[in-house]
From Swiss-Prot:
Homotetramer. One of its GO terms (molecular function) is racemase and epimerase activity, acting on carbohydrates and derivatives. Belongs to the hyi family. Substrate binds at residues 152, 179-182, 211. Its EC number is 5.1.3.-. The active site is at residues 146, 240. The keyword Hydrolase does not apply. Optimum temperature is 70 degrees Celsius. Is highly stable at 55 degrees Celsius. This is Ketose 3-epimerase. Shows the highest enzymatic activity for the epimerization of L-ribulose to L-xylulose. Is also able to convert D-allulose (also known as D-psicose) to D-fructose and, to a lesser extent, L-tagatose to L-sorbose, D-ribulose to D-xylulose, L-allulose to L-fructose and D-tagatose to D-sorbose. It comes from Arthrobacter globiformis. It catalyses: L-ribulose = L-xylulose; D-allulose = keto-D-fructose; keto-L-tagatose = keto-L-sorbose; D-ribulose = D-xylulose. Pfam families: AP_endonuc_2 (PF01261).
Length: 289
């Protein structure tokens, strides 16, 4: 199991300087893995990232959220095509990095929709994601669909919805990405969804209810980590938190970061690393109970 940190904890810019900085700070905070947000996979500097990862002995994963212009759940074939091309380039970036986990809101746009998903849109989404998963499989990459709250997609808001989506596709490298921040909004509890998705769960985000310090909000982390222990989860566990003191203004607005709960990301990151590792250490003792 690798304990990781989202790159946006450290910087809002992923040019060469931002890539190097996020890798360095992720390692200094004690994490094993950095999650790169591929805002533009076509311009991402793979060679700089590879060099920085090798220098600091760090693993990597990558994620993204689609936009209106690349929404694969659209009924417009041109928009779906643009989204699929973006996802394919992201998969290529992962392969070039030597990484194996691609995740995020990659089945629809990451936005507040004003209407339910349509049957035609869902069919387009599944077809595009299936093709991307096939390409990723050829490159040894797992693709995990992030389940997010109702204000960020109209397609996958719960673990059970994700299971139903995956059932039709039936790709062995296609899995589910759960996030405690979103679960706290949409799920009935923090235990059942982990058990329900156990066979498909490939990636986990750890975030507090208010996007701030872990343990200071309403997320039931004790129950969540017990559930991970129950199913023997051993995939990536990645800390995610946002502050407009770091994240670019456009992304801050999209994520609804209207107040900052932290300014010192070094302290925040070190605290999160210790918090997650302490929880994982504790659940190992449950078998002795």
């Amino acid at each position: 199991m690798k304990i990781g940190c989202h790159g946006l904890v450290w910087t809002g810019h992923f040019d060469a300087e931002g890539i190097r900085y996020s890798v360095q700070k992720t390692r200094e905070a004690g994490f094993d893995l950095v999650e790169f947000p591929l805002m533009d996979p076509f311009s991402f500097d793979v060679q700089t990232a590879k060099s920085a990862l090798a220098e600091h002995g760090l693993a990597a994963s990558a994620s993204l959220g689609l936009s209106d212009a690349t929404d694969v759940s659209s009924e417009d074939p041109a928009v779906v095509k643009a989204g699929e091309e973006l996802l394919n380039r992201a998969v290529d970036v992962l392969a070039e990095l030597g990484a194996t986990d691609f995740c995020g809101v990659i089945y629809s746009a990451m936005k507040k929709y004003m209407e339910p998903a349509t049957a035609a849109g869902l069919a387009n989404s599944k077809a595009a994601v299936g093709r991307v998963a096939d390409r990723a499989s050829d490159l040894g990459i797992n693709v995990s669909l992030e389940v997010v709250n109702r204000y960020e997609t109209n397609v996958l808001n719960t673990g059970r919805q994700a299971l139903a989506y995956l059932e039709e596709l039936n790709r062995p490298n296609l899995g589910i990405h759960l996030d405690t921040y979103h679960m706290n909004i949409e799920e009935s509890d923090m235990f059942s969804p982990i058990l329900d998705t156990a066979e498909a769960l490939r990636y986990v985000h750890i975030g507090e209810s208010h996007r701030g310090y872990l343990g200071t909000g309403s997320v039931d982390f004790d129950t969540f980590f017990k559930a991970l222990g129950r199913i023997g989860y051993d995939g990536p566990v990645v800390f995610e938190s946002f502050s407009s003191s770091v994240v670019a203004p456009d992304l801050s607005r999209m994520l609804g970061i209207w107040r900052n709960l932290w300014a010192d990301n070094e302290e925040l990151g070190a605290h999160a690393n210790a918090f997650i590792r302490d929880k994982l250490t504790a659940i190992k003792t449950i078998e002795l109970h």
